[in-house]
Curated annotation (Swiss-Prot):
EC number: 1.18.1.2
Catalytic reaction(s) noted: 2 reduced [2Fe-2S]-[ferredoxin] + NADP(+) + H(+) = 2 oxidized [2Fe-2S]-[ferredoxin] + NADPH
Organism of derivation: Nicotiana tabacum
A biological process from GO: photosynthesis
Cofactor: FAD
Name of the protein in its database record: Ferredoxin--NADP reductase, root-type isozyme, chloroplastic
Binding, FAD: R151, L152, Y153, L154, C172, V173, R174, Y178, V193, C194, S195, T235
Amino acid sequence: MAHSALSQVSVAVPLQTDSSFRRSTFKATSITFSDRSSWISMPPIDLKAAPSRNQHIVCMSVQQASKAKVSVSPLSLEDAKEPPLNIYKPKEPYTATIVSVERLVGPKAPGETCHIVIDHDGNLPYWEGQSYGVIPPGENPKKPGNPHNVRLYLIASTRYGDSFDGKTASLCVRRAVYYDPETGKEDPSKNGVCSNFLCDSKPGDKVKITGPSGKIMLLPEEIPNATHIMIGTGTGVAPFRGYLRRMFMESVPTKFNGLAWLFLGVANTDSLLYDDEFTKYLNDYPGNFRYDRALSREQKNNKGGKMYVQDKIEEYSDEIFKLLDEGAHIYFCGLKGMMPGIQDTLKRVAERRGESWEQKLSQLKKNKQWHVEVY
């Protein structure tokens, strides 16, 4: 039986002054699936890069899910009973290597978001839902003679990484750029040091990593048919990409047969992150995956205002509350500003149903169904 076997192909080409790619012909490396091994030859294609500040190398990934799940190794990564924590600390970080930097968003997206693959050679294992700390090069201007502070990033891959060999980790990073409110001009002195370092990095660059850290967003897998409701904004989708790859892409001992429901909030279509990957899961696993997008600059809510994730939550509130009553886990990840609106919506829905949101939230936390990681 034939399967769509393409999992990931990367091609690195220098950026021209007009920020466009050369015509490239490439061939995939061998990818091993749980039932066979395949080679795929790709015809010549044109890849047009959106204008990017990265003037070094961008590695574009052709990445799709496949119903023939990908074999992963080493399976010994499944053996640990507890998640790895703080293997490397700020005073003695691990020096990893940048593998690739890929611009994820289109030209109409406000801002730039990059997918960054880091090679740790298997020395910095992690679980889905954990974070790495990154220490950018240079001196901390507030503490002369000291390195920059650690910046935490939730990992956007499974423990096996995008190469499925347990040697890489992926980060989803939005470049932080500061614009003067009076002049409207960029002030580079106030730009985010770490995000710009990562988005400007090129293959072969070294990066200091700490961690892994975090237990709040770990994916509970004791019940294979559990329901997981994921609500993310922007780069907050990172841990959910890891969850979904583990559920639907990788051949792992934990055979997921429940429901995963992703709500993703971004500005517009060009801002969607990993959308092709999620759409493929939707097509391949319609009984196990639901995917709802809230595009604030393109969609309207039922009151005629901008569409945010809390509006989607309210739209499906009866289903969501029923699933929570049945034991579903619910996860929130993104900017801190997302939570007040979401909490207000959940409280309003609960009151409409004749319930106390405070009591319900307390019970969800007690049952370890409530997971929040905001920054």
